[in-house]
């Protein structure tokens, strides 16, 4: 068999394996990175540590920096672009959504494990970790989603291309 062909096939195999990588494989890095932003102030429409974050801007920035994926900008668009999972299936790095403005998927955070999530909560507050079982969050829980690393998703664009 042609050695050049074998080399090309091996390159393709590695590229496919890289594409098949899941966010779960980078979950601890994602959570550790997100924890590095604890205390950053909330800013409506904010997308950076320098200016401050809103909830979806925080999630988007963490995924772009750590996983190399550019999620949609708003919480409801992020929910639509990700895979629905059962709350019992939550793993670190998954997204958790809440109805905080009398509409579904109006708030988003990153699940960190042990029933807790990290998020940019509201004006006057800072990025922090909270317990999902606290009555405020438990009553408003809207659903859990998992982010796939496939760059073929309609609303999911790979930032590392």
Language-model regions: role of each:
Residues 7, 11, 105, 112-161:
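Aromatic- and glycine-rich peptidoglycan recognition patches
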Residues 40-92:
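Catalytic cysteine-centered active-site loop
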Residues 1-41, 147-161:
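Intrinsically disordered, low-complexity
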Residues 93-95, 115:
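Structural motif
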Residues 21-28, 49-57, 84, 135-138:
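Soluble non-cytosolic domains of exported or imported proteins
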Residues 28, 32-36, 57-61, 65, ...:
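Solvent-exposed, polar/charged alpha-helical surfaces in well-ordered, non-transmembrane soluble domains
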